UniProtKB/Swiss-Prot annotation:
Keyword list, A-Z: Activator, DNA-binding, Luminescence, Quorum sensing, Transcription, Transcription regulation
Name the record gives this protein: Transcriptional activator protein LuxR
SUPFAM superfamilies according to UniProt: C-terminal effector domain of the bipartite response regulators, Pheromone-binding domain of LuxR-like quorum-sensing transcription factors
UniProt organism field: Aliivibrio fischeri (strain ATCC 700601 / ES114) (Vibrio fischeri)
Record GO biological process: bioluminescence; positive regulation of DNA-templated transcription; quorum sensing
Annotated family: Belongs to the autoinducer-regulated transcriptional regulatory protein family.
Higher taxonomy: Bacteria, Pseudomonadati, Pseudomonadota, Gammaproteobacteria, Vibrionales
Length: 250
């Protein structure tokens, strides 16, 4: 990495830190794309507040026709980039997915993306503290572009900017409060023990309080997490990171 690239990266990082809204974030994404010589970009974070209907946040300049088709056809479920990003942290070149076998009954998302103008591309996985995940993707419509060279160039630059980008995006979008910030320590304790299969009586003995108190705390978690029963509260608390192994330290 030369001095010119370092200065450009520092300039973008400083600009990201001063972003006040998603429009500013979008402008920074556009500048990052220019630095790594890419035509398209997509920044997406999936918040698993619900298994059936997760909250998906996207900032991009992808072709509108492709985005509409992607959403209408429910391609999120079959997207190999999304699947990869769930459990990986290293960037990946999309050409890796071209070599993998696709089930006959499943749509070939990469091939369909290419037919819509996203010929080549690569992605950087994103993971948040509240079990959210996503990716920062870049693509190009030029089939003759040397993707491996672009990918290498991006891999030395984007990781320097991505942490600031994710942090400031989440800071701006504060309407998505972390569930663990609204639960009290006692409520977390009751949920954590309930997730271990303990009954109300068991939890009362473990925590040294009455069964009525345990029921009170668990009922409060339902209201705060917008759930209808104990099982759903446990599920949502785990999905959103409201309860985890070190809960007693919170």
């Amino acid at each position: 990495m030369n001095i010119k690239n370092i200065n450009a990266n520092e300039k973008i990082i400083d600009k990201i830190k001063t972003c006040n809204n998603n429009k500013d974030i979008n402008q920074c994404l556009s500048e990052i794309a220019k630095i790594i010589h890419c035509e398209y970009y997509l920044f997406a974070i999936i918040y698993p507040h619900s298994i059936i209907k997760p909250d998906v946040s996207i900032i991009d300049n992808y072709p509108e026709k492709w985005r509409k088709y992607y959403d209408d056809a429910g391609l999120l479920e079959y997207d190999p980039v999304v699947d990869y990003s769930k459990s990986h942290h290293s960037p990946i070149n999309w050409n890796v997915f071209e070599k993998k076998t696709i089930k006959k009954e499943s749509p070939n998302v990469i091939k369909e993306a290419q037919e819509s103008g996203l010929i080549t591309g690569f992605s950087f996985p994103i993971h948040t503290a509240s079990n959210g995940f996503g990716m920062l993707s870049f693509a190009h419509s030029d089939k003759d572009i040397y993707t491996d060279s672009l990918f290498l160039h991006a891999s030395t630059n984007v990781p320097l900017m991505l942490p600031s980008l994710v942090d400031n995006y989440q800071k701006i979008n504060t309407t998505r409060k972390k569930s663990d910030s609204i639960l009290t320590k006692r409520e977390k304790e009751c949920l954590a023990w309930a997730s271990e299969g303990k009954s109300t009586w068991d939890i009362s003995k473990i925590l040294g309080c009455s069964e009525r108190t345990v029921t009170f705390h668990l009922t409060n978690t339902q209201m705060k997490l917008n759930t209808t029963n104990r099982c759903q509260s446990i599920s949502k608390a785990i999905l959103t990171g409201a309860i985890n192994c070190p809960y007693l330290k919170n």
